A protein has these predicted regions:
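Conserved PLP-enzyme active-site core in the AAT-like
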Residues: 2-294
Length: 296
């Protein structure tokens, strides 16, 4: 039986499994200071054209979101996100449990607009009792979104411009980023590094056993980030297992190949549904498909 409920029902791609087996008995330093993590960082910096970025490897998406937001925000600040966002709907209140409110914005397709962000922040700042309300200080978007939709390059550029004008931090959750990169008109890794304060490159949903690579451009977020990783339970002792996987994913374009295959396979499913007259809840070009059930 073929199952379709998520991106992580199998183990890892053969290239990663082979390297894990080949290097299994090597002895390296722990906690991400090994040669494999260093090599992976350099490959990602090159791919992003971001040689001033700090790169950290974490095990999963919720852990990455929690750690980044904790590092970026002060206690009185919150993060704006779509009402369907992963940090709002699928992380068991992890962000709020550690002291930061998720400020939700309305959405019809999983995306939020620069105009809505700007309007919310300006309303907050115009409120005479603003200091009694959580201060909006970060914008969180995922690429793709929870509905499978994607931000185009112009949309992300507009969000980035508004965030910079208003002094907000822009954070992109890239748990499914390889699929977005395979879609036409979407921001590249170099665009993300240019437009965002921080983002991460998902591995768990794209052929790795586990792992997300956090790319930090904002110097304020870089400060003491490893302390914050450790405090939030994210300092993986056998860190080389993360580095080795990302080193493999960024060898010979493997990360991009995986995303293209995922999107292509989903396209076959989409076409089969459409041939039967079945419609979709959202206009998703990625591998997240939401067919609307029909009765005959």
């Amino acid at each position: 039986m073929i199952r379709f409920e998520s991106d992580y029902l199998e183990g890892a791609v053969p290239e990663i499994m082979s390297r894990l087996i080949e290097t299994n008995y090597e002895q390296t330093a722990g906690y991400g200071v090994d040669p494999y993590c260093r090599a992976a960082r350099e490959k990602i910096k090159l791919e992003c054209n971001a040689f001033d970025a700090d790169i950290h490897f974490l095990v999963g998406g919720t852990q990455a979101n929690l750690t980044v937001i904790a590092a970026a925000l002060r206690p009185h600040q919150g993060v704006m996100a779509a009402e369907t966002a992963h940090i709002e709907a699928h992380e068991t209140g992890a962000i709020e449990a550690t002291g930061h409110k998720v400020i939700t914005l309305p959405t019809t397709d999983g995306k939020i607009s620069a105009a809505d962000v700007k309007a919310y922040v300006l309303r907050h700042r115009a409120d005479e009792s603003f200091e009694h309300i959580v201060q909006p200080a970060m914008v969180y978007v995922s690429q793709p979104t929870e509905t499978g939709t994607v931000y185009s390059l112009p949309e992300l550029e507009e969000l980035s411009s508004v965030c910079r004008d208003l002094g907000l931090i822009l954070f992109v959750d890239g748990a499914r980023l390889s699929c977005a990169l395979a879609c036409e008109g979407t921001p590249s890794l170099r665009d993300l590094a240019r437009l965002c304060d921080v983002f991460y490159i998902g591995g768990t949903k794209h052929g790795a056993l586990f792992g997300e690579a956090v790319v930090i451009k904002n110097d304020a977020i870089k400060k003491d980030f490893r302390y914050i990783i450790k405090q939030h339970g994210g300092m993986f002792a056998k860190g080389r297992l993360l580095g080795l996987q990302f080193d493999t994913l960024f060898t010979d374009g493997l990360y991009y190949k995986i995303g293209r295959r995922e999107v292509a396979q989903a396209g076959k499913l989409r076409a089969a549904f459409e041939a039967k007259g079945i419609e979709f809840a959202y206009p998703s070009p990625t591998n997240q498909l939401f067919p609307i059930p029909v009765s005959y």
